[in-house]
Amino acid sequence: MGVLAYVNTFTVPFLLDDNAGIVENDSIRHLWPPGRMLSPPGQTTVAGRPVANVTFAVNYALGGLNVLGYHILNLAIHVLAALVLFGIVRLTLRTPGLENAYGAAASPLALVVALIWLVHPLQTESVTYVVQRVESLMGLFYLLTLYCAIRGFTSERVWWSVGAVAFCALGMATKEVMVSAPLMVLLYDRVFVSGSFREVFRRRWKPYVGLAATWVILAALVATGPRIRTVGFEFKDMAVLDYALAQGPIVLHYLRLAFWPQPLVFDYGWVMPQATVGVAPGVLAMTGVFAASVLALVFRPRLGFLGAWFFLILAPSSSVLPIRTELAAEHRMYLPLAAVVVLVVVGCRRVGLSLPRSWRRPAGAGLAVVVVALLGYATRERNGDYRSPLVMWTDTVAKQPDNFRAQNNLGSELKDAGRLDEAITHYREAIRLKPDCQPAYCNMGTALTLRGEYAEAVDSFARALLLKPDDDITHYHVGYCLLRLGGTAEAVKHFRQAAALTPTDARRRQDIAAMLAGYGEVEEATGYYREAMQLKPDWPEPVNNLAWLRATHPDAHFRNGVEAVALAKRACELTGYKAPWTLDTLAAAHAEAGDFAEAVRVAEKALEIASSSGQDEMVKVLGEHLALYRSRRPCRERPEEAKPYRAGGVRR
């Protein structure tokens, strides 16, 4: 069932936070030595979550950035979690207090619970959105911790308890929500096995010491502050009480989605309430649900355990700890949904007992098949919204038009698709909704730049810099626009600022160098090329570009055939002498050095490779260059102006 519901996700591209957490995450590029992948970059979804980062490193080792492997592993994790949930529910329904009522039906009831939880559309964000593997993997470890603990309660084998502690430790290093796992194991023992906390600790205090010790792992990871910009108590615009009050209607919304999973939203953009009265109904309703759970835990503890499961697992993200970027997120319901499903399935079983005996089994089986089929279909349909970033953000804006982030990100996707007028409309809407939305100003500037409206773009970038003066991307774009407007001196200042703000970014220096070279600032460009080469010695692009400049610049003062040959040979070595563009540069360098015979030989090799690989445009250029060398003339050409401009902007 899981494969049927998620088979259309295997080609879903990387989205939003996948870029920082996977695509741009250098820590997953190598499995050895392991220290790098165990130290994921800060301010990303994998920050402080080394176990999840290791799984991404394994994916990268097996298939690079091919999304297929990532989605297969995400689905495998989800299916395994459903299987473990099946085991937990079945074992629980066979405990002494429940066996008489549910023991005979434990397996089919557990199967229905697991299937509904597996195919429920509310789970799509945790499975289809690749980087949210942190949620599903944590969920798997959470369930494995409880399953091993349950088996250990009735077994003489110590390995079940050891397994519980081991999985708990892995979960703590996967996501912070795992913090409640030792408490849930303790509560389960008290409610379903031992009958009292005194009896729990009398029988088996040692496993709980081990489980509690895993909090040290979590504390150590949290202490590094990897997401201090997005999670914490120090935000002036997000007080603890306000955040907690906002969670009332949000959690109520989660419960509604559990029963009616429409509409599902990728990014809610839920805003902080401006007045308490606005959230009062939701807060009162959730207070009632919470109070009922507490009372049930006291007077009907087996029922109350479901409420405790729901609220304790949601607590780290949906109570008093402000998460600035997301007040609401569907992936937070990954594990809490299980409590709702168990309650509904067991409740339906109780209702079904009122039917005539001959009707019970077919009615129950029929209802289960219909519900699972409908939920599976809805999940498959929802997964279709993930097929491209443009589709996803279009869907999000349609459902949440007041979400400034969604408006901004839809604008960026439209810009990338060449639909600049539409993109600018959405950027302006994002700014209307949030006048201090710095990324929208920056992104609108890039769209205006692509339309050739450089003066207007500079105005937009200037507003972005007022909001965030240390934004290297904005300085870079301003520099480009000023170059196009003739303000070379001011442009150089902004380029220098962009470089200073990114002291280890070779790409930024390469782009600045290529742009400056295109506008005649050769000395400045040469310096940035050399910095890029020092920062990333095995990257051929800056080496090749500097070689091209030294070989072909129209001003003899900047040409140097000997240096050009040395640089071009290095670029060819880095590309295995198989890249037509580096061979083209080497041929030009030999021609500048006066060795036209070698220039012809290398150019012919480049032409052969380009022809065999269907690079028609490159074939045309190489043919022109080859004709020059055969007539004993060197290549003289200014660097291509348009090439270095990268209108990436800022998404969020």
Regions found by a protein language model. Give the residues of each.
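Polytopic membrane enzymes that build or remodel cell-surface glycoconjugates and lipids
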Residues: 1-456, 462, 468, 473, ...
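Structural marker of alpha-solenoid helical repeat scaffolds
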Residues: 399, 433, 467, 501, ...
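Conserved alpha-helical positions within TPR/SEL1-like repeat arrays
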Residues: 405-416, 439-450, 473-483, 507-518, ...
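Alpha-helical adaptor scaffolds
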Residues: 446, 540-582
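Terminal, low-structured helical/coil segments at or just beyond the last alpha-helical repeat
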Residues: 558-562, 570, 577-580, 585, ...
